[in-house]
Amino acid sequence: MSKKRPHREDYSPSYSNLDPIKKSHHPPNLSPRRAEYVAIRGALDRNHHQFQQPQMGKRPTFASYIDTPNLPLKIKLLCEIIATTLSSSVEKVLDETGIMVSQDDVEQVLKLSYEYPGPAVKFFRWSGLQLNDKHSPYAWNLVVDLLGKNCLFDAMWDALKSMKKEGLLSLATFASVFSSYVSADRVQEAIMSFEVMDQYGVSRDVVALNSLLSAICRDGKTLQAKEFLSIARDTIRPDADTYAILLEGWENAGDVASARKTFAEMVTDIGWDPGNVPAYDSFLTTLLRGPEGMRETLKFFETMRDRRCYPGIKFFKVALEDCARNSDVRVAELLWESMVGKNDCRPDTEMYNLLIGLHMYLKDTERARKLLDDMVYYGAFPNSQTYNLMFQFLLKGRKLKEASPIFSEMIKNECAPNHENCCTAIRVYIDNGDPYMAIKIWKWMIDNYKSDVEEIGNFLVVGLRDLKRVPEAVKYAKDMIDRGIKLNSSTLSKLKQSLSKAGKGPVYDELLRKWKTR
C-alpha cells in the first residue's frame, strides 16, 4: 500500500473526457433584469469579501469508510486504496488487486470517498473499464457532487458535459450543483447554473427553481433567494412549494417581518390551499417565536382555520411546548381540538406528555387520565415519562387511590418509575398510613435500583415501626443488611426501643449480631 498523502494532493480527475471548464459554462444570454441582478449581487459580494478578514473556506464533514460499520470487505479495501494511494498510482494498485466491481460497488465506494476527490475519480474511470463505461446515473451524480463539494468546479462541469453526451443529466444533478456552489458561498454561480441548465437538456421550470431556492435557503441565505425569485417570477410562476421554501428560510432566520411579507405575497399569488401545510407550519412557527408570540400566532391560526387550512405537526408541538411553559391550558386545548378533532393530525407520545403534564400541573386529573386512555386510539403509546408525570403529580396531590393503579399499570407495561418517584411514593404512603403500597414499591425499587436506596430504606423501616408494624420493620431491616444496604445506627436504636418494649429482646440481639457482622 502506498504512503498516506494529503487530502488535496493531485486533485485533478484526469478522466479522459473531462475537460477544464471554460467561461462559456456561464449563461451567455441573460435577460436585462437578470444580468443587472447578477452584476449587482456580484459587486456586493466582492465588496463584502474585500473588507472582511481572510477566512478559511467552510470545510464539509464527509462520511468515511472508517466510521461505517459492517462494511463489506471488498468495499472497505477499495476505499482504503483511494484514501491512502497517490492519484497517479491508484489505477495500478487497483489493477493489482484483481477485484471486479458492480455498479452498486462503485456507488458505495464513491459515497465514502468524498475526502479524496482525485483518487476517487481515478477509481471511477478504472471501474468504468470493467463496466464497459455503463456507470449508473447515480454514480455519475455522485462524481458531480463529490467534485462540487470539494470546490473543484471546472472538473465538475466537465463531468456534466460527459453526462450530457450520455443523456444522463437530471434535475438531481443540478440540485447537487446548486448545493455545492451555495455551500462554497458562491450563490451567483448557483444562479447562473440554473440559467443554463436548459442548455444541458434539463427543464428550467418551477421544480428546478424550487431546488435552487431550497439550496440557497438551507445555507441561511434566504434574502438572496427572495431577491432572485423577484426576477425569476417574470418567466416562472411560483407555486406553493416555492413559498414554503422561503417561509422555512425565514423561520430558520427568525425573521418575522420578512415572513409576514412573504406570507401575504403567497396568499395574494396562489390563494389559500389546505394542502399547503409546510408553508403554514413554518409561518406560524416563526410568529410563535417572534416578539408577539402566541397572541399574533393565534390571530393568523384562526384566520387559517376559518379557511380550513392548518399547519403541521411541527407547529403544534412547538405551540404545545409554549402552552406548557406558560400554563395556558385554554390555548392548548383549542390547538389540540384543531389538531386531533378537525385536522386529523396525529399527535405523538411527546405531545401527549406535554398536555398530560399541563393538566396534571393544573390538578385536572380526570382530563389527564382521559388523554392517557385515548393515546392508543391515535397511534401513540404511553412511555415511562407519561406514567412518571401522572404518578408524580398524583403523589404530590395526595391522590393515592388514583396513584396506586397507575403504579401497577406502569410496572405491567414495563415503564419504570424513576428513582425520585419511588422515594416520594414510599414517603407519601407511609405518611398516609398505607404500609402495603410502600412495601410493594420498595420491593420493586430494590430489584431495579442498586444504589442510592439507603436513605429511603431506613425511612421505610422506621415508618413501619411507627405504624406499629414492628415485625415487618425487622424483616426489612434484616433484608437491607443481607443486601448490603446500610442500616443506620439511629434506625437500629429505634427498633431496639420497640422490641424491648414488646419483650422481644432476643430478636433485637439477633438483628444486632447480623448488623455487626456486615
Region locations from a protein language model:
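The canonical alpha-helical register within tetratricopeptide repeats
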Residues: 126, 162, 196, 230-231, ...
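Inter-helix linker motif
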Residues: 131-132, 166-167, 201, 220, ...
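N-terminal targeting peptides
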Residues: 1-176, 181-192, 196-200, 207-210, ...
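Residue-level detector of the short coil/turn that links helix A to helix B
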Residues: 151, 185, 220, 254, ...
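Pentatricopeptide repeat
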Residues: 102-106, 136, 140, 156, ...
